[in-house]
Amino acid sequence: MGVDIEDYIKISQKYRIGERNGKGSECILNTNILIFKGEYLNGKKNGKGKEYYRNSKLKFKGIYLNGLRNGKGKEYDENSKILFEGEYLNGKKNGKGKEYYRNNKLKFKGEYLNGLRNGKGIEYYNNDISKFEGEYLNGKKWNGKGYNYRGNLAFEIKNGKGKIKEYYENGKLLFEGEYLNGLKNGKGKEYYRNSKLIFECEYLNGLRNGKGKNIMIII
């Protein structure tokens, strides 16, 4: 659970008189719960710093400039598992970076712009086999090839368009259908983990749209 906006307001009011310079820390008002420790310049976070969850686990460590994440940094979940490591600009992911599954397996490595995947990248299954290799645009797969859980070619996308297949981590088919502008658009089918068909319908901008056929499975 993160710090709510009221807590942040109280913290900013507490330190309004005088500007911080050098090393310092921030706690939630009227508690000893640490939420930040690092360097300041003219009252703003500048230089090395660390953010913390309420449970005292590390949330982020990296470089700040003018109060925002800038430069190299690492993000963690509340159980200290790494989620992301890479470059930031003005508080957003920019440049090269890596995302991780909660078991520390690599999930994605590639380029970012304004917090989204942009440029070359490789997405991975949890078994280290490539899921998609190619180019992203505004967080969407745009040009490249997709692979099944065994590493065999499953689909190809050009300029955000093509027919795609997505898989569960047990290798079973999850979705197959049409892709346009980097999203599910057109006819598609969804499947259970046991390969039984769940649903087939039309999609628009990544969402189910219009009439569809829901397949009931009686166990």
Give residue ranges: language-model regions.
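Glycine/tyrosine- and acidic-biased, solvent-exposed loop/turn segments at the edges of beta-strands
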Residues: 1-219
